[in-house]
């Protein structure tokens, strides 16, 4: 009997020490205001008995679970101080995502999933080059300042967001800003001749500016003297006749610009005015496109921020709503969805019209296979 009491005494001591330690941890969380409690919540905790403190804490921890978890790690393992709002890898996070999760991290495709899809859909998807040997390139052209048009305030958010996204997808990104139509064409032609395309498996072109139905506005655009880079010109520069290095490889064109004119409020509109088609678009050029498009133009997909004749909207403090939704959908779904599915997710996010409505549109789709980005692979 005495021996039994002797054995129980150390256990009671350990139990008491454990309670004291846990209570100290919980007190630390409250004192550092990790849970962002109001004074009455703190009072309720401090007034509770020791055995009730865990229950009181649990009732208030759901919304602050991540922050409290990091503080617990710091307390138990004495790791370096990390801000509760700081992420270890802000641009990448292993997939798959949890249901209903909101995140600003790019979900990575598990290597096993990458291998499975490559094997099962080998005849249906574009081949992906080895990460260590490929040299993917992307080009962003963004005009924000104009001689005769209002500035595109907030476009810097679009540049930053798209650059980070494409770099996360393993593209080296070139950024060109505030170019005339002629300079935009020169930049595109120079980009098309880059030798890195030979060892790449795809490319992205991101064009952001004021726009009209037929193309993207340069920085000196005026109603009386248009300065417009025609969309047809972009496709001609990168077709299989003029850019052999990207033959049979996905060429993704993303356009944030109006494709018509309309008046609006609250949001800044990406349209200079109601303009007629530029006279520089000759019928001869159109005939050439019509004859050779089937033979020369292949493996393209264009994703425009709005339907023809309509405007696109931009928040001057946050960036374009199209680019914002595009980045979000790439982050959430590119690990498991092919490109067209990701674009459809973007369209679905605009399905219910808002106060200022627009509908992103997939156009000039000539891809013969599915294009998976397989982030992280």
Swiss-Prot record:
Its EC number is 3.4.22.57. GO terms for cellular component: cytoplasm; cytosol; endoplasmic reticulum; endoplasmic reticulum membrane; extracellular region; mitochondrion; NLRP1 inflammasome complex; non-canonical inflammasome complex. It is found in: Cytoplasm, Cytosol; Endoplasmic reticulum membrane; Mitochondrion; Inflammasome. Changing residue 321 to D: Abolished ability to cleave IL18. Residues 1-91 form the CARD domain. The active site is at 210, 258. Keywords: Acetylation, Cytoplasm, Endoplasmic reticulum, Hydrolase, Immunity, Inflammasome, Inflammatory response, Innate immunity, Membrane, Mitochondrion, Necrosis, Phosphoprotein, Protease, Secreted, Thiol protease, Zymogen. Widely expressed, including in keratinocytes and colonic and small intestinal epithelial cells (at protein level). Not detected in brain. It is a peripheral membrane protein. The modification (Microbial infection) ADP-riboxanated arginine is found at residue 314. It catalyses: Strict requirement for Asp at the P1 position. It has a preferred cleavage sequence of Tyr-Val-Ala-Asp-|- but also cleaves at Asp-Glu-Val-Asp-|-. The modification Phosphoserine is found at residue 83. GO terms for biological process: apoptotic process; cellular response to amyloid-beta; defense response to bacterium; defense response to Gram-positive bacterium; innate immune response; intrinsic apoptotic signaling pathway; intrinsic apoptotic signaling pathway in response to endoplasmic reticulum stress; non-canonical inflammasome complex assembly. In response to activation signals, undergoes autoproteolytic cleavage and activation. (Microbial infection) ADP-riboxanation by S.flexneri OspC3 blocks CASP4 autoprocessing, preventing CASP4 activation and ability to recognize and cleave GSDMD, thereby thwarting the inflammasome/pyroptosis-mediated defense. Coiled coil: none annotated. Activated by homooligomerization induced by direct binding to cytosolic LPS, in a TLR4-independent manner. In addition to LPS, CASP4/CASP11 may also be activated by oxidized phospholipid 1-palmitoyl-2-arachidonoyl- sn-glycero-3-phosphorylcholine, an oxidized phospholipid (oxPAPC), in dendritic cells, promoting adaptive immunity. The role of oxPAPC is however unclear and another report suggests that oxPAPC competes with LPS-binding and inhibits the non-canonical inflammasome in macrophages. Residues 1-59 are annotated as: Required for LPS-binding. Residues 1-80, 271-289 form a propeptide. Changing residue 289 to A: Abolished autoprocessing. Residues 84-104 are annotated as: Disordered. Disulfide bonds: none annotated. Induction: In peripheral blood mononuclear cells and purified monocytes, up-regulated by bacterial lipopolysaccharides (LPS) and interferon-beta/IFNB1 at the mRNA level. However, this increase is not observed at the protein level, which remains constant in monocytes and other cell types following LPS treatment. In monocyte-derived macrophages, some up-regulation at the protein level is observed following treatment with LPS and IFNB1. In SH-EP1 neuroblastoma cell line, up-regulated by NF-kappa-B RELA/p65 at both mRNA and protein levels. The CARD domain mediates LPS recognition and homooligomerization. Inflammatory caspase that acts as the effector of the non-canonical inflammasome by mediating lipopolysaccharide (LPS)-induced pyroptosis. Also indirectly activates the NLRP3 and NLRP6 inflammasomes. Acts as a thiol protease that cleaves a tetrapeptide after an Asp residue at position P1: catalyzes cleavage of CGAS, GSDMD and IL18. Effector of the non-canonical inflammasome independently of NLRP3 inflammasome and CASP1: the non-canonical inflammasome promotes pyroptosis through GSDMD cleavage without involving secretion of cytokine IL1B. Belongs to the peptidase C14A family. This is Caspase-4. It comes from Homo sapiens (Human). The lineage of its organism: Eukaryota, Metazoa, Chordata, Craniata, Vertebrata. The gene is CASP4.
């Amino acid at each position: 009997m005495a021996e039994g009491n002797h054995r129980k005494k150390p256990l009671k001591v350990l139990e008491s020490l454990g309670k004291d330690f846990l209570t100290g941890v919980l007190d630390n969380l409250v004192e550092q205001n990790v849970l962002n409690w109001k004074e009455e919540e703190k009072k309720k905790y401090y007034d509770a008995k020791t055995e009730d403190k865990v229950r009181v804490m649990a009732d208030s921890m759901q919304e602050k679970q991540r922050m409290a978890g990091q503080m617990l790690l710091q307390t138990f393992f004495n790791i370096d101080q990390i801000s509760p709002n700081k992420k270890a890898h802000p641009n990448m996070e292993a997939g798959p995502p949890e249901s209903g999760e909101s995140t600003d991290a790019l979900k990575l495709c598990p290597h096993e999933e990458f291998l499975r899809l490559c094997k099962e859909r080998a005849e249906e998807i574009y081949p992906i080059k080895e990460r260590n040997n490929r040299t993917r390139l992307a080009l962003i052209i963004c005009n924000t300042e104009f001689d005769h048009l209002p500035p595109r305030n907030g476009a810097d958010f679009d540049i930053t967001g798209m650059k980070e996204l494409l770099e996360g997808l393993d593209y080296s990104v070139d950024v060109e800003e505030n170019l005339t139509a002629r300079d935009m064409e020169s930049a595109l032609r120079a980009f098309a001749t880059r030798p890195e395309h030979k060892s790449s498996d795809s490319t992205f072109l991101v064009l952001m500016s004021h726009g009209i139905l037929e193309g993207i506005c340069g920085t000196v655009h005026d109603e009386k003297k248009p300065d417009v880079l025609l969309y047809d010109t972009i496709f001609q520069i990168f077709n299989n006749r003029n850019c052999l290095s990207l033959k049979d490889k996905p060429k993704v064109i993303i356009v944030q610009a109006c494709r018509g004119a309309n008046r609006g409020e609250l949001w800044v509109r990406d349209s200079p005015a109601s303009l007629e088609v530029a006279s520089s678009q000759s019928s001869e050029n159109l005939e050439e496109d019509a004859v050779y498009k089937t033979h020369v133009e292949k493996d393209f997909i264009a994703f425009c921020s709005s339907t023809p004749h309509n405007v696109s909207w931009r928040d001057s403090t946050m960036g374009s709503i199209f680019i914002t939704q595009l980045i979000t959908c790439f982050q959430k779904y590119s690990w498991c969805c092919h490109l067209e599915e990701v674009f459809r997710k973007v369209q679905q996010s605009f399905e219910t019209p808002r106060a200022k409505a627009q509908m992103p549109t997939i156009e000039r789709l000539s891809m013969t296979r599915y294009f998976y980005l397989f982030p992280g692979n």
